[in-house]
């Protein structure tokens, strides 16, 4: 029987986001397997959920991207000496620096193992290089692994392990249908979608998401006689309001006022996806993973996206007919048109499962501890 492990995950805060979601998923898996799960962060809206699911939370200001964070080295080192975790799993750069500096001042007998996860393709710098300092460096996709090898040659390839993010099929079940109440509210809120083939572009309102390409696609499909409507699902930060106004101006210029809808941030993305005939991924830069693409495919919704980054990896494995060479807008329109005309849904997804992600991560923990 495996001995009980004490694992401490460290990240800036517990607000919404992919890093935070992954932290909670691993914490939940640790508790379910009978291990002690501790998370250190500056707090946030997900703390109560974390604690309710059986983990411990310790509040420490490990979030500030400034020299003031160095003042957290001593209290964090005291915390490590008191708890004596087997592993510290750093999930972001400032927490990783605080951890590395704390471990330097500890005796080898007291020092926990360090694991890092590279969640994104950070700006290449000595500051970011700290994420390659783990005994094991977890990359969330092959794309991230390539980024590490290309930009940080001092990182031994043998220390890098790819563990793809995953989706729980019970959370995004194949051919899921929303409740009658939800459908009634949806139809009342968005009557303009009735009788339309809905194209969805999920993601926050930023210049990287490919909105202008999306508008052009909607215009072209409409010109070909398809009854399409574009749905942009994602929140907008206050500082991005000028960009939103720019997008709205572009919509007017293309005479798509009645053909594009912004929903804002939605907490019911599963239900929203079921009302879409096609989900698009058109980011101008490679995504590190592409979770929304995987969620849509799990539901059986067809996806079309640029064949790059983590999205390209997912499409290659689960829905290759939806992959389009980056920037080829002619092929994009042809692929989207074919998907809408044939009305072919995606096939059940059998890879990129949450259970696999959790199992592989816990196996890394056990292997690192066992190699002592």
Where on the chain are the PLM-derived regions?
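A conserved mid-protein helix/loop that constitutes part of the nucleotide-sugar donor-binding site
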Residues: 17-28, 197, 201-220, 242
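Short hydrophobic beta-strand element within catalytic cores of glycosyltransferases
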Residues: 39, 302-305
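Short, structured helix-loop element that forms part of the nucleotide-activated donor/catalytic region
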Residues: 45-51, 229-257
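Short His-centered aromatic/hydrophobic patch
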Residues: 90-96, 118
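A conserved, positively charged/aromatic
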Residues: 108-142, 153-154
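Active-site donor-binding acidic/aromatic loop of nucleotide-activated sugar
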Residues: 239-244, 257-266, 272, 323
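Acidic donor-binding loop of glycosyltransferase active sites
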Residues: 274-288, 301
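Conserved acidic donor-binding segment of nucleotide-sugar-dependent glycosyltransferases
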Residues: 317-330, 337-341
